[in-house]
Amino acid sequence: MSTQPERAGLEASRLITVLANELKPVPPPQELRFGQSMTDHMLFASYDPVNGWSAPEIKPYGPFTLEPNSSCFQYGTSAFEGMKAYVGPDGEPRLFRPEMNIARFARSAARMSLPPFNPDELLKLIKALVAVEKRWIPAGKGYSLYIRPMIVAIGLLTSNTALLWVMCAPTGPYLKGGSQALSLLAMRDTVRAWPGGTGEYKVACNYGPTINPVQAALDKGYDQTLWLLGDKITEAGVMNVFIVLKRDDGGIDLITPPLDGTILPGVTRDSILALAAAHPARMTLPGLAPTTLLHPSERTMTMTELQAWLAEGRLLEMFSVGTAVVVQPIGNIGYDGKDIALPTFEGGRGPVGQALYERLTDIQDGRFEWEGWSVRCED
Amino acid sequence: MSTQPERAGLEASRLITVLANELKPVPPPQELRFGQSMTDHMLFASYDPVNGWSAPEIKPYGPFTLEPNSSCFQYGTSAFEGMKAYVGPDGEPRLFRPEMNIARFARSAARMSLPPFNPDELLKLIKALVAVEKRWIPAGKGYSLYIRPMIVAIGLLTSNTALLWVMCAPTGPYLKGGSQALSLLAMRDTVRAWPGGTGEYKVACNYGPTINPVQAALDKGYDQTLWLLGDKITEAGVMNVFIVLKRDDGGIDLITPPLDGTILPGVTRDSILALAAAHPARMTLPGLAPTTLLHPSERTMTMTELQAWLAEGRLLEMFSVGTAVVVQPIGNIGYDGKDIALPTFEGGRGPVGQALYERLTDIQDGRFEWEGWSVRCED
């Protein structure tokens, strides 16, 4: 269209900040429930196909008005992200590999036909928001400020009018039991993602259909679902999955399903693979012997294989990973009416999961410098 | 929960009607664009898990305010329906088999973990809304009032707080070209629905992911997509599909994919199957000889079969059906880089499609009484 070049981009330099007159009390860390206490402010911008992006605003968190025929209600046209800000020993707010989340956010938005934005500008804006909300970031291991960027189509189907906002909520450990091993119910009848579907994008449409099956798992006494595609293991709840296997050569395989379109390309997933690959040649993982060779790989894993590995005594650990949980051990899988008990460990995680958890949270909190993954919000 | 019995149901007897002070001008029928001119009023009710359903209201159509962390934005938790009101020769507004839409609406809502409602009460309320908006129903074949019931989760994921509303827009023939034959692009890479997915429900999540592939089809000069699952034909755009085949015994097969979980159980689909089964024993379809025996059936159909039927000269007609289009002929399928030309007919529809279209619209408009399918809004 001829108007395209004149449309404004999302520009951090146009940021308008209007602070709340009255600030809310920050709840004590132990009272935090995941994503339930929104901070004082949000980042907000709107897009229309004539003018492009509005000047972004940091403004008091609050409701907005939408037309009843907005396409997001009818067609689920929305994409989102989940990322975290941390405060480390220096008291400075930090983000963890935020460019990966923002790049995925842009891909998810494009998949849902939502308007494009400049990822670098959005990162600058998120840093500005986190700097404003710094007092909300709880200190302490397992605590952080959860950051939820969203982009949602409003107006009619073809209008390409959208709202983008970023909201924040302080958060403690994701699961009540801390690092206790999860008991998962493997789902055969409900399929989270399929070839040609949207499983590799972080779009609203992947989540609504999972609410009922997750509730069914809870009702049966499980903590979460294990998503299957036929016999293939794909994800656990909203997390990627890893299996740790003993090798014949004394080393350890660390495997996770490949990014075949049905798997969310998780930032934690990618980080786990990278950290495992770095041990021990480039860095020793805490608590793991430098002589223990880790062999990370992306490969298909099936329930049949899982049971065989278990029977052979090769399956050492299974865990799920994600921004919310970081590394969460899996101790049991309900499958075809029986429970498959996996190796469990005092304190929760097995040695490989624990080593990766420690190193990852050290990097996130700014206690260990690694490849620029932990990014300061204030220069 | 102990509070459950005290929660209010959706009750038509509690309806509060507040009419708009100023009514909008009704656009001339020829200027109507599908779903773009909302009428003066909407039906509205809200649900919370403590109080249940609010007293339903008919009130001026207008925006509402939502919290940025409403679950519909993050998880696509919404379901909807598409139905139509017609005015026939008697000038009375009518609905077409509305109980089927409302039953599907309740099933879709339940699939998305949205609160339950009494379908009979919702039907009473929709009739009341249509009666209020009677002046908006355009007269004439192919014209009607499109009715969009919606139910959307607001609030936090687990809060089960929801809004239900019904909005209306006058509408003319769905596709600009009237009954001209559609040219469809068969989609291999993007899959609309999958076993274990939500294809059989009318939920927002089924639609957002189709916007890009539909645009890709339009960009290549096609009118719509033909959805495949592997080699299987499933749906066309947002429509069910039928193929008409010549039988060796001189009769005619009318086939459509079975409701295996990947197919929306369309009201028009069901009506077409029923009308075909009634011909000629119980009723003669207009323009079809009583000696022409129709054999409707639900069976899997593949692209391989379609091409074989075409080569054998057995494929007489292919058409798509739905509330919006009623019966729309399909004249071409782009598949694996080539175009498959289907039989086309002067005026658009072939004899079987035309006969079914005529009888169905006669029933919808109240010109032909059939099994109580056309339901008056005012008693």
Feature map (PLM): residue ranges:
Chain A
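Helix-start/capping segments and mature chain N-termini
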Residues: 1-129, 153-379
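Internal, well-ordered alpha/beta segment that forms a basic, Gly-enriched binding/recognition surface
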Residues: 129-132, 140
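Extended, Lys/Arg-enriched charged tracts that mediate electrostatic binding to polyanionic substrates
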Residues: 137-152
